[in-house]
Curated annotation (Swiss-Prot):
It is an enzyme of class 2 (transferase). Keywords: ATP-binding, Kinase, Lipid A biosynthesis, Lipid biosynthesis, Lipid metabolism, Nucleotide-binding, Transferase. The gene is lpxK. GO terms for biological process: lipid A biosynthetic process; lipopolysaccharide core region biosynthetic process. It comes from Polaromonas naphthalenivorans (strain CJ2). ATP binds at residues 58-65. This is Tetraacyldisaccharide 4'-kinase. GO terms for cellular component: plasma membrane.
Amino acid sequence: MKQVLLKAWRARGWLARLLWPVAQLHGLLVRLRRALYRRGMLSSERFKVPVIVVGNVVAGGAGKTPLVMALVKHFQAQGLRVGVVSRGYGRSGHESLEVRPGTPVDESGDEPALIQHATGAPVFVAQRRTQALRDLLAAYPATAVVVCDDGLQHYALQRDIEIAVFDDRGVGNGWLLPAGPLREPWPERLRQGVDLVLHTGQQPAFEGYTSRRQLADHAVAADGSSLALTALAHQPVVALAGIASPEAFFDMLRARGLTLQKTLALPDHHDFKTGDLNALAGRTVLCTEKDAVKLFALPDHSKIKLLAVPLEFSPEPAFFTALDGLLTPLLSQLPSSHGHQTT
């Protein structure tokens, strides 16, 4: 059914038209909810530090998490104390939790675990992102800026900067769920607060900043050792991906000159279990970094030669120039106890 809808969302065919009346009701509810927050009839919370929300208006993944990691590293390079909050999609609990190196992935969620591993920044997860942010600031009161992963529709959290992310799907047929892929009306949502638009695909459908994404030229084992992908170029390998667009990962592996003997396209946030790898015993298996945070934790991952291939994601310089232009005035209003790290 998912694939049927994804196909229907590309155009305004018979199925999309059949669902269009429901989409109109969805649109009314979306606009009503936003109006209630805007008029203060539903409560929202503002924090003393700048909050940057990264999200999308299209259902499914579009590259939000790689952008969050790129933002964190950008701010860290400037010496800023930065934290991250997330709902932690797919996690087993709902309580607020700091994601640490030893936190089980089923408690943190795969994306928060990856963000913490890749950046070392404080990462907090909770069902309500406002609670996660309160706990983050209580634990790290000198934090200068907070990045919220996937929170564009979480209006209970007031934000200073909004970044909307799009892949090559753009807005699809331009209709709201379930007749189309849109969670919110576009470009109406652009006029109502989105500050920056970033395209993560190769063919931007409309105006916005662009980015470059490709796989690294090496893969990483569980012990942290690296292996050049060229060393795998003349042997068949298995590739698996439990992300929103597995085929994109497979295509990038092929672009690196690899021969994929078998591909395993799994649902986004797939919950790997002990025994899942038995059928691949003795094989060389390439996976995404997001899958690796779960697979490396399995006691039987040593049965296979499991390697994670990092994604290199770089927004164009003009994007960061625009972002810094928005953030700098906000940082200047912070107390002196916030801001740059001391060395």
